[in-house]
Regions:
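Radical SAM enzyme core and accessory elements
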Residues: 1-120, 124, 202, 418-482
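A C-terminal junction/extension of Radical SAM enzymes
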Residues: 28-37, 41, 361-438
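N-terminal [4Fe-4S]-dependent radical SAM core
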Residues: 96-99, 119-167
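Key residue(s) within conserved catalytic/signature motifs
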Residues: 147-148, 180, 257
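Canonical Radical SAM [4Fe-4S] cluster-binding loop centered on the CxxxCxxC motif
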Residues: 162-197
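Beta-strand scaffold of nucleotide-dependent catalytic cores
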Residues: 170, 282, 351-355, 425-426, ...
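Conserved non-cysteine loop/helix-boundary elements of the Radical SAM core domain that shape
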Residues: 185-385
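Short, glycine-/Ser/Thr-/acidic-enriched flexible segments
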Residues: 228, 405, 441-444
Length: 482
């Protein structure tokens, strides 16, 4: 365990995130003057890193060694917090001998900097210099961020920010819960009797949105989860029939259904989606190594993945995404290489490459305690293997985001053929358009003209969502009252 003593609570989140990035295998705890006395008494003797803040700079003590920062000698045009993060990064880099690929950036949207600077008319060289010197981002990652930001800007030119919105519908059921998952999901076998009532509740929530957003342009629709294809064909048909009867789809640029788990996909369900003109689906293997699928509790076999993908092609889908996760338990570079080779053979239209994120609420934490974090192996080489596979397929990177506690401190990257980019994926990351979310555990984000964002969430519990659907609608009414 790494215990960090911070003299002021203002920067607790930033300090924790950056220290955790350097000490990925350790539990990191930050104590401040606001920490409860009993916890302070327990943890203070274990402090291994102490940060003392002052108006003129800061001092960091690591063991017996002190590191000093004189803020007055640095141009703090971007604020004290960023100056502190640079100082902390330099200190930890010196102590550990590590350089992080994304430098001191700890947020989920590292492309945001490049995007904003492009909007200001800055050149690639200026953006690269800023990211390298102000945030210590590697040249490779900085160039990737610039490349993706340019592509995002081009793709979003046709999107109606103020006069439009996107719609998300969450189906929180799965065949089983995967080891690494912390999303709202429930085993379909135990909830089968509630599914019809759940669909009824979603349609009721849908009615409110359809009635109150008639003056807005609907740009994208995304049905995710969970696993939407855990619904029976008749339930899928009822849900999407209601959706298309209530909303004007003539303006919709992308209609995605995350089919996801191969063990939930059937020809009949695919035919329902195709008949309703779903334009993009996902068939997500995560890995093509059967032993790993067994470990992570993903009951679909490699053969089922292949069958589901081929079925989707036979039915007529011409925009199929596949998701992979790097850093899964026990997987090495050779395993990733074999997975990528199989993906290249299948030739999907887009590929989303995730770095495993260790979520506090997932069963993966327990697995790590039993097997050790060293069994999670993600490296720069595995990232390059995946990128090379996408390039071999003729794909370009089009969106990128990061998560807390991500294996190898890398990123999630979406690759696609030109014309097959996932617009909703970009919109959810860039936070430039209102996204209205329906279903249990979903979060609606309202984006105001000045860039301000306000949210309202639906309860996660399926039974409570059904019971309190009127309250969920009231929450949306309050959010959009102005």
């Amino acid at each position: 365990m790494k215990v960090v003593k911070l003299s002021h609570p203002n920067y607790e989140y930033d300090v924790h995130s950056l220290v955790k990035a350097f000490y990925a295998e350790d539990q990191v705890t930050v104590i401040t003057p606001e920490t409860k006395p009993e916890k302070l008494a327990e943890l203070e003797p274990q402090v291994s890193l102490e940060i003392e803040l002052a108006e003129t700079g800061a001092k960091i003590r690591v063991g017996e060694e002190d590191f000093l920062w004189d803020a007055e000698t640095e141009n703090l045009a971007d604020g004290y917090k960023n100056g502190l993060k640079r100082f902390l990064y330099r200190t930890l880099s010196k102590v550990t001998g590590q350089k992080l690929p994304w430098g001191n950036l700890t947020g989920i949207r590292p492309t945001k900097i490049a995007y904003g600077m492009l909007d200001e008319g800055r050149s690639d060289a200026e953006i690269l210099e800023f990211m390298e010197q102000s945030h210590y981002v590697s040249e490779e990652k900085a160039l990737l961020g610039i490349d993706i930001a340019k592509r995002e800007r081009d793709l979003l030119k046709e999107i109606h920010y103020e006069g439009g919105y996107s719609l998300y519908i969450g189906i929180p059921f799965c065949p089983t819960t995967c080891l690494y998952c912390s999303f709202t999901s429930y085993p379909i076998a135990a909830f089968r009797r509630q599914v019809d009532a759940y669909v009824d509740a979603v349609i009721k929530e849908m009615d409110y949105v359809a009635e109150n957003f008639q003056d807005k342009v609907l740009d994208t629709v995304y049905i995710g989860g969970g696993t939407p294809t855990t619904l029976e064909p008749e339930q899928l048909d009822r849900l999407i029939t209601a959706l298309k009867s209530k909303f004007d789809f003539s303006t919709v640029k992308e209609f995605t259904v995350e089919a996801g788990r191969a063990d939930s996909i059937t020809r009949e369900k695919l035919e329902v989606l195709y008949r309703h003109q779903v334009s993009r689906i996902s068939v997500n293997p995560q890995t093509m190594k059967q032993e790993t699928l067994d470990i992570i509790g993903r009951k679909a076999s490699v053969e089922q993945v292949l069958t589901a993908y081929r079925l989707a092609r036979e039915v007529g889908f011409d925009n199929i995404n596949m998701d992979l996760i790097l850093g899964l338990p026990g997987e090495l570079e050779a395993d990733v290489q074999r997975t990528i080779e199989k993906i290249v053979e299948l030739a999907p239209d887009s590929l989303t490459v995730h770095s495993l994120a260790i979520k506090r609420a997932s069963r993966l934490n327990q697995w790590i305690q039993e097997n050790g974090v060293s069994m999670l192996h993600n490296t720069d080489e595995t990232m390059k293997i995946a990128a090379a596979g996408a390039e071999k397929l003729g794909m370009k990177p089009y969106y990128l985001y990061r998560q807390k506690n991500m294996s190898g401190n890398f990123e999630n990257t979406g690759y696609a053929h030109p014309g097959k980019y996932g617009l909703y994926n970009i919109l959810i990351m860039e936070e430039k358009q209102t996204i209205v979310a329906l279903g249990a555990g979903s979060i609606t984000k309202r984006v105001f003209p000045d860039g301000r964002i306000e949210r309202c969430d639906n309860v996660k519990d399926v039974g409570l969502y059904i019971e309190k659907i009127d309250e969920m609608i009231e929450r949306k009414k309050e959010l959009f009252a102005e």
